[in-house]
Design a protein with these regions (language model features):
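Conserved phosphate/anionic-ligand binding catalytic regions in large, soluble enzymes, centered on
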Residues: 117, 309-325
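Amphipathic alpha-helix face/heptad-repeat signature
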Residues: 272-275, 318, 348, 352
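Conserved catalytic cores of very large enzyme subunits
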Residues: 2-311, 332, 338-342, 358-515
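Active-site loop/helix belt of alpha/beta enzymes
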Residues: 338, 342-347, 353
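Well-ordered alpha-helical scaffold segments within catalytic/enzyme domains
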Residues: 324-332
Length: 516
């Protein structure tokens, strides 16, 4: 007789294979996750296991047997220059070669989503192969390439980078993205005031007005951590070492930790340090399996051909629910202040970020770049209820954009592997994109690492860091979607008031399960 566990597994698999809204490829993906999650979890200390079971710590549903890194950032420049022995490919000689080679390699780059989350610094990669092509000839090729990416790798966590320099490829990508208004790929423009022309930044702002893309990253801030050109921004907005990536992402539920604290002092001296240690234990256990049992780094041709280096992978030490944690702690202390509203509450939030950063900087991990994890303000998952992503302000009653940026900016100094806040701007900004440029520059002057904006009235909007079409959400449940992240946005709409709120789109990252 089948056990209750076996019956439950069969029921979940049956739900997947009979779903009217999943494509065959999507069904295969979720069936594989069910199989992986039927395996035993890596051995954990008792307290770490309890924290995971109680939801104080979340492993992002990455799976019980991490047999591949969460995020992989290959050295695409090396690949284009030398080709691949494993794939029996010679190096590129022209732009057509380069685009063809990239489209081949993308299908061999693993990630938590089973699709590549990093496409490379595309303008820097492709510009050397342009040769004698005219701008029109470049535009045709890039538009075709852009459409190919969305149709064959339909996942909005797939992320391309451009900038800080100007080039015909840079302009072609911006034109294609604005015209096609695709959910994927995600896009970040890396800004450097010493390199980026003013008219190029204005063009980037016009693109945001048109399609809510790209993110704009503060290049000099990232350069200090990774060195110039030594990193990529992937998935939603994760900053990670190039030729490496992110091995795993585990996150603290700060709201749950605050609920288990007797006072503000108890939070900082007992509960937060305790759960930080448990999170490190989970990170180490997952990385131990990846490095020692999965054999990924021993067998991958990406390692053998020098496209990735196991020592350049870093675990991400995530957190979320800061807003709720601060409000709970203020209530326990009798402080009449709310996060994002009063300075006293904001200071508690900054203190939490500072203590997390100090812990991560001073706590070694078994496997990781520089033997440390990297702090990440995690942007939520689609099933989260009652928590605000990362260090963001609670949704629905945000202040004006300038006050908003000034309030969240101090957090950005601490989160080396990514933090983002989404501004929602009135569509009148389309008549004055220079105002958007000034907002961005002001944000960077205040210390922000990333600038991201949605423009009211656009069908294409950003949910956390990934894109969805609002029109797709309305028809997903009846018809399904070829894009793997539409269901996440639809689930977020069911679990929150995303479609009822003022035009700020909430943030949720990939959740590794299927629910009808």
């Amino acid at each position: 007789m089948p056990t209750s566990h076996e019956n439950a597994l069969q029921q979940r698999c049956q739900q997947i294979v009979t779903s009217p809204v999943l494509s065959p490829e999507q069904k295969r993906h979720f069936l594989a996750l069910e199989a992986e999650n039927n395996l035993p979890y890596p051995a954990l200390p008792v307290e770490a296991r309890r924290a995971l079971d109680e939801g104080v710590i979340c492993d992002m549903f990455e799976g019980h047997a991490p047999y591949k890194p969460r995020y992989v950032l290959p050295d695409y420049a090396r690949f284009l220059a030398h080709g691949s022995e494993w794939l029996e490919l010679e190096g590129a000689k022209d732009l057509d070669d380069a685009l063809s080679l990239l489209t081949i390699l993308y299908h061999h780059v693993p990630s938590v989503t089973s699709m590549p989350v990093y496409l490379g610094q595309l303008d820097a990669l492709l510009q050397p192969y342009v040769r004698i092509l005219t701008q029109d000839e470049i535009d045709i090729r890039i538009k075709r390439f852009w459409r190919y990416l969305d149709r064959t790798l339909p996942d909005a966590f797939m992320h391309a980078n451009i900038g800080p320099s100007d080039s015909p490829i840079t302009r072609a990508i911006l034109r294609a993205d604005a015209e096609l208004k695709q959910v994927s790929p995600n896009l970040t423009f890396i800004y450097d005031p010493e390199i980026t022309p003013d008219d190029l930044l204005l063009e980037v702002a016009k693109n945001i007005c048109e399609c809510s893309k790209p993110h704009i990253a503060n290049g000099p801030v990232h350069d200090k951590i990774f060195t110039k050109g030594g990193y990529g921004i992937v998935s939603c907005y994760n900053s990670l070492p190039l030729a490496g990536g992110g091995s795993t992402l585990v996150r603290l539920n700060l709201k749950a930790i605050a609920e288990r604290s007797e006072s503000l002092d108890d939070f900082f001296t007992r509960t937060l340090p305790h759960y930080c240690q448990q999170q490190i234990a989970i990170i180490d256990a997952r990385c131990e399996f990846l490095y020692q049992q999965s054999h990924f780094f021993e067998n991958s041709f990406l390692v053998k051909e020098g496209l990735i280096n196991p020592e350049r992978f870093v675990p991400m030490f995530g957190m979320y629910g800061l807003a709720e944690a601060v409000n709970l702690l203020c209530e326990k202390e009798g402080i009449a202040a709310r996060y994002g509203k009063e300075a006293a509450a904001n200071e508690v939030g900054y203190r939490i970020s500072a203590q997390l950063a100090e812990f991560v900087a001073n706590t070694p991990v078994k496997y990781g770049w520089q033997k440390r994890a990297m702090l990440h303000a995690q942007s939520g998952i689609s099933s989260d209820i009652g928590t605000t992503p990362g260090a963001r302000l609670p949704y629905g009653d945000e202040p004006d954009p300038i006050t908003h940026l000034q309030t969240v900016a101090p957090h950005h100094a601490y989160y080396y592997s990514g933090i983002s806040d989404i501004l929602t701007l009135d569509e009148t900004i389309k008549r004055n994109p220079q105002a958007l440029v000034q907002l961005c520059l002001g944000a960077f002057k205040a210390g922000m690492r990333e600038f991201t904006a949605n423009v009211s009235g656009n069908d294409l909007v950003r949910v956390t860091g990934y894109m969805v079409r609002l029109s797709d959400l309305e028809k997903y449940r009846a018809e399904g979607s070829r894009t793997n992240t539409t269901w996440l946005g639809e689930e977020a709409a069911r679990n929150t008031r995303i479609l009822e709120r003022q035009p700020r789109v909430i943030s949720h990252e990939q959740q590794m399960r299927f629910s009808q």
